[in-house]
UniProtKB/Swiss-Prot annotation:
Classification via InterPro entries: WTF
Family: Belongs to the WTF family.
Compartments, record wording: Spore membrane; Vacuole membrane
Membrane topology: Multi-pass membrane protein
Transmembrane segments: 90-110, 120-140, 150-170, 186-206, 222-242, 246-266, 276-296, 310-330
UniProt KW keywords: Membrane, Transmembrane, Transmembrane helix, Vacuole
Protein name, per record: Meiotic drive suppressor wtf13
Species of origin: Schizosaccharomyces kambucha (Fission yeast)
Signal peptide limits: none
Organismal lineage: Eukaryota, Fungi, Dikarya, Ascomycota, Taphrinomycotina
UniProt biased composition (Polar residues): 1-10, 58-70
Region (Disordered): 1-20, 37-75
Length: 360
């Protein structure tokens, strides 16, 4: 008979065996006996021992020191090129002594006539220069590291200062721009009133004869307009819409130029020379047109682009209205004619027919 052997261990028992560590690692070998009576002893290969002793086994050499890469490069250069390194130290030391000597020559030499000047110059040349030479040549590495660290700290400090200054200026400009943009209506009215006052002053100077008429026309159409446009550019709209603003400015100046050309052409065609009154009318009309076009462009961007189409539609609507009016007048005249024609037809009925109709 075959003995059918079945294990009475359940899956939970097998899991407990794994947890208790009855299985041994093939690489580490069989676990040694564990004496629980020893104080502070922990079972080997356990996770608790790893946590209790986090220092690796090969850490007996001590902690490694972090070295500066600049110091390493300098040491490598010194070891590989000792002659060049010594020559460089000597050259820098001599240059420092030369700088000290010329500084003493410039500052102390004018006082050489006095005893104090002679003593100061002698001390500077005889004591200070050798001390500077010895200090720089013998302690070259120390003071170069100190100077490099000082330069590094200074550069970082200056960079931080520049960064903070730029950020502060940007915030100030943003606050000012937002404030001006939010209060644009009041400022626009103020600038517009100032423009009106300036133009009236110019017109008054023209009237009194203290200003040439051509200059008044140029000032009223070019200088004042350009100044106002650029001031309103900074007040009414953000600075980044400069392209749109300049385009509107050139469009307004173009319209003003067209008005000037048309006005002068009509006056010359009618054999009327432009006198003082003509110049005043022209300048005033340009002033009004410039104001209207500019404020209309500011309230509705792109209005100047749509203006030719708008004018064409207006002219077409006006001509259409005139055509409709003429058509209405023609229809009215036709109705009146039909009425007169009907009256004439009634008058042409014979008298005999009228008597017959009355008898019936």
């Amino acid at each position: 008979m075959k003995n059918n052997y079945t294990s009475l261990k359940s899956s939970m028992d097998e899991g407990d065996e794994l947890k208790t560590g009855h299985e041994f690692d093939l690489e580490k070998g069989i676990l040694p006996e564990y004496n629980s009576e020893e104080e502070g002893a922990l079972p080997p290969y356990s996770d608790i021992s790893k946590l209790a002793n986090p220092v690796p086994e090969d850490s007996s050499t001590g902690p490694t020191e972090t070295t500066n890469p600049n110091v390493e490069r300098r040491q490598e250069f010194k070891d590989s090129h000792p002659n060049i390194y010594s020559l460089l130290r000597l050259l820098i030391s001599v240059l420092a002594v030369i700088v000290v000597f010329f500084t003493a020559w410039v500052c102390v030499n004018p006082l050489e006539k006095s005893i104090f000047g002679k003593v100061a110059f002698s001390v500077t040349i005889g004591i200070t220069c050798p001390i500077v030479f010895i200090a720089i040549f013998c302690f070259f590495e120390t003071w170069t590291q100190a100077v490099a660290q000082c330069i590094k700290v200074t550069v970082i400090f200056l960079a931080q200062c520049v960064k903070v200054t730029v950020i502060s200026l940007a915030k100030c400009v943003k606050v000012i721009a937002v404030g001006l943009y939010n209060s644009k209506k009041d400022l626009v009215v103020t600038i517009w009133l100032a423009w009106v006052v300036i133009c009236f002053i110019l017109f008054g100077c023209v009237k009194d004869g203290r200003l040439n008429l051509n200059k008044a026309l140029i000032c009223s159409t070019s200088s004042i307009s350009a100044a106002l446009f650029f001031i309103l550019l900074l007040v009414c709209i953000p600075i980044w819409t400069l392209k749109h603003m300049l385009f509107g400015l050139f469009q307004v100046l173009g319209v003003q130029s067209c008005v000037v050309i048309v006005t002068k052409g009509l006056m010359y065609l009618l054999d009327k020379h432009i006198d003082a009154t003509g110049y005043e009318i022209e300048a005033s009309s340009l002033f009004v047109i410039g104001n209207f076009l500019f404020f209309y462009e500011m309230e509705r961007p792109g209005a100047l682009k749509r203006m030719p189409k708008f004018i064409g539609n207006g002219i077409a609507s006006f001509l259409g209205g005139i055509a409709n009016a003429i058509r209405g007048i023609a229809n009215a005249i036709g109705g009146i004619a039909n009425a007169f024609r009907g009256a004439n037809d009634n008058n042409d009925i014979p008298l005999g027919e009228m008597d017959v109709e009355s008898e019936v």
